[in-house]
Amino acid sequence: MHMGAENMAKKAAKRKNTRKNTGSRKNGGRNRLWIIFAGCCIALALAVAAVFQKPVRRHFSYPMEYEAEVRRACEKYDLDPCLVFAVIRTESFFTPDAVSGAGAQGLMQIMPETGEWIAWRQGKEYDESRIFEPDYNIDLGCWLLSFLLEKYKGDVELAAAAYNAGHSAVNRWLDDPKYYDGKNLTIPYEETENYVKKVKDAYEKYQFLRESEHEAGRE
């Protein structure tokens, strides 16, 4: 009886150890699966962040909406797209139906009389019904920007000031030694001064982002 009881106890202990070892192996397997799963999630998150980091940054802080229309007009009028994006961002923040208190309209905030003058210089009829169409508005604005850059020999500050205040006002300032010393222009309009700063800052940012994307593409 004693030996039988001892054998039964040994068998019971063996079964207990077997169940314990099996449970440990199962728990170990589950832990390894969780570790692998967590690693895959982290790797996927990093990959997604790398792919979408630039577009998210670009489109939320410094959008490049209507890119096809902008690039088409820039090729037509020999402009840097970064400058046009900077002007649109400053003028309307890419809102195609924007209307200012003064009556400027669309993405590049074209005044009706300015639109008529641009169309006349282009030898075309001004179509006010299309002023909120991105391609039409951008074409008018890019023509004007190109005209001003040519007039002021590529000076972005003067061109931006003229885009905001009109080239007649800028011409007066340039002829007045109180505002222009032959090198530096003091803009007497606070609104225009702030506008020029915003355009220049945005232009530099768009150029930086473009260069960053080119560098990333070469890696």
Task: State the predicted function of each range.
Residues A49-E219:
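Catalytic glycan-binding domains that act on GlcNAc-containing polysaccharides
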Residues W34-F52:
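Hydrophobic membrane-insertion alpha-helices, especially the h-region
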Residues M1-N31:
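N-terminal Lys/Arg-rich, disordered targeting/topogenic segments
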Residues K26-F37, Q109-I110:
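Extended, non-globular alpha-helical segments
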